[in-house]
């Protein structure tokens, strides 16, 4: 058992070389750098970014790339939804180009309220997923931090020593 082995090693070394910040008191294991214990999932996650209630899982070392791909695919799908809805209205509804936005929306609603709902829903999701994707790309590429590290950088020794900059950043 890894937990028992870790505890025995610490006990037998009389605490020499024991670094409390690299030990998870919940899992009773030595944590790798950049890992964090997620209270929701009750597990330590390497290169922990955040717990995502949307996917019901922690985002970290093993799945961050897949999560980014997931966000990009959602953006593509929502943009296709918008395009399809707009094309439906162009081909199926009599909307004059000189109509105001409000009149166009009323015509869209009378033509197909379901498609109007899909367009509004897609717009909402494009908005927040674009913000989330942009923040994730900024953190990964430009500052070399996870969301957890960016939020808690004042609590981590390796960030405090570098005035809040990431020692893991090797990008542009």
Predicted feature residues:
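Membrane-associated feature with strongest affinity for ZDHHC
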Residues: 1-51, 55-172
């Amino acid at each position: 058992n890894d937990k028992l082995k870790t505890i025995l090693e610490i006990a037998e070394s009389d605490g020499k070389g024991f670094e409390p910040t690299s030990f998870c008191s919940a899992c009773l294991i030595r944590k790798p750098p950049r890992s964090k214990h997620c209270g929701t999932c009750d597990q330590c996650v390497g290169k922990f970014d955040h717990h995502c209630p949307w996917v019901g899982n922690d985002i970290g070392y093993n799945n961050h790339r897949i999560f980014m791909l997931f966000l990009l695919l959602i953006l593509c799908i929502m943009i296709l939804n918008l395009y399809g809805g707009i094309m439906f209205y162009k081909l199926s509804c009599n909307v004059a180009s000189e109509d105001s936005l409000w009149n166009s929306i009323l015509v869209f609603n009378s033509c197909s309220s379901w498609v109007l709902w899909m367009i509004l829903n897609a717009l909402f999701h494009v908005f927040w997923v674009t913000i989330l994707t942009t923040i994730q790309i900024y953190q990964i590429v430009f500052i070399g931090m996870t969301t957890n590290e960016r939020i808690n950088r004042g609590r981590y020794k390796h960030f405090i020593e570098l005035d809040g900059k990431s020692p893991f950043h090797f990008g542009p």
